[in-house]
Amino acid sequence: MDSPKTLARVEVKENGDTFNVKAYEKAVKSYITKRKPLGEALDEEIMDELSVKFGIVDDALEDLFKQIQDAGISIVDKDGNPSPLALVTDEIEKEEVSDTAMDEIVTNVRIDDPVRMYLKEIGRYPLISLDEETKLAEAIIAGGEGAEFAKQMLAEANLRLVVSIAKRYSGRGMQFLDLIQEGNMGLMKAVDKFDHTKGFKFSTYATWWIRQAITRAIADQARTIRIPVHMVETINKLIRVQRNLLQELGRDPSPEEIGKELHMAPDKVREVLKIAQEPVSLETPIGEEDDSHLGDFIEDDVIESPVDYTNRILLREQLDEVMDTLTDREENVLRMRFGLDDGRMHTLEDVGKQFKVTRERIRQIEAKAIKKLRHPRRSKPLRDFM
C-alpha cells in the first residue's frame, strides 16, 4: 500500500466518508499482527475484514495480498490450500525462465562459481508445455510407480522458476545459492500438494510456495539477531521512504519527516531504525594490513582501570599497616563493622555475638579504635587516597 496512485483508485466510501488511508493501514497492521502467530490467513476473512470493509479492489487488492504474504503469512482457502485469489498476484512470465533470462542473471546478479555451475546444471532440463504439465500432475495423483518419476520431472522442469524468483530477493542478507535452496524446498512442497483440477497452472501455484519459503528464510536467517517477519516488512517500508526522502530533500530525513510519510510517531521511527541496525563483529579487521580489530579500540567501562586497580592495592596495603597498630580485638571489630575483608558490613549485634559481648561494648571498642586512627601519625598515610 505504498503507492498513493493505487489508493486513489479506491473510490468506495466507508460509512459515507471518504477513504481513510490511516484507518486502513492501521487495520492491515492489526490484522497482520493477529494472524502472524498462526502463519496463515483465510482468503474469505481478508475479504470480509479488509477488502469489503474498505472497498479494496483490483490492483489495491493485489497489493494487500502481497503485503500480507511478505509478512510471512500464507493466504489459504477454507480447505487449507493456497488461495486462488492470492495466486493471481504471482504470475511468472515464460520469458523469465528462458535461457536468455538465466544468462541475464549470471550477468546482473553477483554470483560465484557454485551458482554458475548450478545454473548450467538446471539448464539441461527443458521447460514443459501445459499439456505435459497436466499429464505429469495426473500421474502424480494416480500414484503407483510412475508418481515419483512424475514428481521429479515436474520439479526439474521448474527449477528455473525458483532461480527467477530468488533473484528478486538477492541483496537481503542471504547468499543467492541459499535463496535458491530455500526456494527449492518450497517447490517440492508445491509438487506434493498440486491439484491441476483447481484450474490454475503449476507455475502459478508453485510461485506461491516458493515465495513463502524464501521470505520466511530471510526473516529467520538473514540477520545475526532474528527480527519478526512483520517487523522486517516495517523496516523495509521505512527504508524505502527514507531513501525517497533523501532523493527529494538532498539530505538525510529526520525521524519526524519519515514519520509524517508513514503516519508513524517519531519515537516509533527511531525505535525501528535502531532495530534495523546490523550488529558489527568485534573481530572486524581495522587498518590496511588487518593487524588489529574493532574490539581493540572499544573501551570496557565495566572492568577496573589499571590506575584504579593500583590505587586499590596500595590503599589496602597502607590500611593493613595502620590496622596493625591497633589491638587484635579493635582491628577485628573494625574489619567486621566496615566489611574490610568480605565487603559485608556487620551490625553491632552481629559483632557482639561473635565476641560474646554486648552491643554497647562493641560500640565502645569501635569508637576507641576510630579515635586512634584519627591520630595524625596513623591517618597521614591514608589521606593521599582521599
Curated annotation (Swiss-Prot):
Annotated spans, Sigma-70 factor domain-4: 322-375
Region annotation Sigma-70 factor domain-3: where it falls in the sequence: 233-309
Subcellular location(s) of the protein: Cytoplasm
Keyword Iron-sulfur: no
Top-level taxonomic group: Bacteria
Keywords noted in UniProt: Cytoplasm, DNA-binding, Sigma factor, Transcription, Transcription regulation
MF term (GO), any: DNA binding
SUPFAM superfamilies, alphabetized: Sigma2 domain of RNA polymerase sigma factors, Sigma3 and sigma4 domains of RNA polymerase sigma factors
Record-linked PANTHER family: RNA POLYMERASE SIGMA FACTOR RPO (PTHR30603), RNA POLYMERASE SIGMA FACTOR RPOD (PTHR30603:SF60)
Subunit structure, interactors included: Interacts transiently with the RNA polymerase catalytic core.
Record protein name field: RNA polymerase sigma factor SigA
Organism per entry: Lactococcus lactis subsp. lactis (strain IL1403) (Streptococcus lactis)
